[in-house]
Amino acid sequence: MEVLLRPVTPEYLDAALRVEQGAMQNHCYLADVYEYYLTTAGELTGAFVDGELAGIGKLTVLWDGSGWLETLRVAPQWQRRGVGTAIYRRYMEQAAQLRCPYLRMYTGAKNVASAGLARRFGLETAMLFREYALPASPEQGDGAGFAPVPADEAAELLAPWARRYNGYLVMNRTFYRFNEQTCRGLAQNGRVWRHEASGTVMVAGARFQSDKGLHIALLEGDRARGLAFAQLLARQRGAGRLVCNFALENAELESFVRQNGFAVTGGDLMTMEIRL
C-alpha cells in the first residue's frame, strides 16, 4: 500500500475534519486551530491512500526549537495499516530539516498503540502527568496587585520552580520544556504574572481555544490569591474552566487543587521525547 504525504492545505480541510471526527469522536479541535497552525513552523501533514485522506499529523516548532508532535489522527478504516508510521517518518524528516534538538509528544498513560508507535521512532517516556479542571466562576476573581512579567525577567523569576514542576510547563496539553526560551516566550505572550507584595507567581493562559479553558501551568506563593486571579482572567477571557496539568510527583500542588474543588479530567497522561 502506497501512502502519499502532502501538506493539508485549505482544500483538504473538510476531509481532515472527517478524519479527526472518525478517529476522535467528540474530542475534536482541528477546526478551531487550523488557522493558527498555518502561522507556525512545521507542517500539518496529510497521508493519502488511493487519493483518499487517511490520516493527519502536525509538527510544531516551539519557542526552544523543539518539535511538538500533535493532532496525529488516522481514520478508523486505515488504522494499523502503516498510515501512522508514514506520518512519523515525515515527522522525523521535518525535524532534521528544521534542526529540532528534541521531539516530544503526549499520549494517554495506558495508550499502548500510540506509545508503541512513538517508541518505534526512538521516543521514550519522560514524565507522567495528571490533569485537573474546575468550572470557571462568574462571581469569583480578584486581580488586585498582579502584573505581567517582562520577557527579560521571566526566566530568572521562574527558574526556582523548575524542579518542582519536573521540568515541564503545560498548556493545552502542550508540554513545554522548562527553559529560558520557554519562559521568555510565555512572558512575551502575556502568560507570566506576578504579585510583588505577596511573592505570588503564576503562569496562565492558553495556546489556543482560549474560550475553552484558562490553563494554569505554574502557581506558587500565595496560591489562593493566584487562584482568585485565575478566576478573574477566566471570566475576562470567556473561558469556561480552569485547567491544571502537572507531574504526578507534585503532590503539594495536587493537594491544593483538590482542596479547591478541581476534579481529575480523565486518565493520567505521559509525555515522550527523543533527543536528536
Task: Give, region by region, the residue ranges found by the protein language model.
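Active-site rim helix/loop that mediates acceptor-substrate recognition in acyltransferases
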Residues: 13, 20-58, 164-194
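Conserved beta-strand in the GNAT
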Residues: 46, 52-60, 68, 73, ...
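A conserved beta-turn-beta hairpin within the catalytic core of GNAT-like acetyltransferases
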Residues: 61-69, 79, 203-217, 264-268
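Conserved acetyl-CoA-binding loop-helix of GNAT-fold acetyltransferases
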Residues: 74, 80-94, 116, 120, ...
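Conserved active-site alpha-helix within GNAT-family acetyltransferase domains
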Residues: 85, 109-127, 249-264
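Conserved GNAT acetyl-CoA-binding A-motif
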Residues: 95-110, 237-247
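Conserved catalytic-core motifs of GNAT/GCN5-like acyltransferases
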Residues: 104-107, 124-138, 263-274
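Amide-forming acyltransferase catalytic core, primarily the GNAT-like/NAT-type
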Residues: 121-210
